[in-house]
């Protein structure tokens, strides 16, 4: 469900090894189209699909045994309902931490230098710098909340920009802090002394 051309291309290429029968639906899974799962063993969904208790119940009645997510998050799935229905749920365990960290830097640069707005203006023939001025990241302070694998790679990149780094984590890695010359501090200190703040932690309810 929720498939794009690149999904179909990837699945078709990999399926040459297995020969599974695969049905592709562009629409997102929900209670209105869950009947399409009739007669299938597994259903594959993405972030905008809905697998709540009602959808899970219908899938189980249709004989679905596996629900595979093409993403790391699973907040769109009622895990308790799936377990009760005997449907196994699997997900992407992790993305490339380098890709996520590098994309984070790209977002920082885009926000700081107002790159999207500048792009729109130049397409309209407007080359004014008014409202587009950013600041040099060199010498500024980045506040990083959560210092897991992705955040550590991000910190290494930001140090290459010549930035100072303040960090907060419930379980500080002081060996890493010494290696990268960063400072663990309180959230309050981080909020008040950072020019840029980046969050790298799980969603907490």
Predicted features and spans:
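An N-terminal-biased, well-structured beta-alpha scaffold segment characteristic
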Residues: 1-88
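Short gly/ser/thr-rich secondary-structure transition/capping motifs
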Residues: 23-29, 47-48, 121-130, 177-184, ...
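Conserved beta-strand termini and adjacent loop/short-helix elements that scaffold enzyme active sites
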Residues: 25-27, 92, 168, 187
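Structural detector of well-ordered beta-strand residues that form the stable sheet scaffold
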Residues: 66-68, 88-90, 128, 166, ...
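Short, charged, surface-exposed secondary-structure boundary motifs
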Residues: 76-80, 99-103, 177-178, 195
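Phosphate-binding beta-alpha-beta segment of Rossmann-like dinucleotide-binding domains, i.e.
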Residues: 85-87, 93-141, 153-156, 160
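Rossmann-like dinucleotide/phosphate-binding beta-alpha-beta segment
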Residues: 130-205
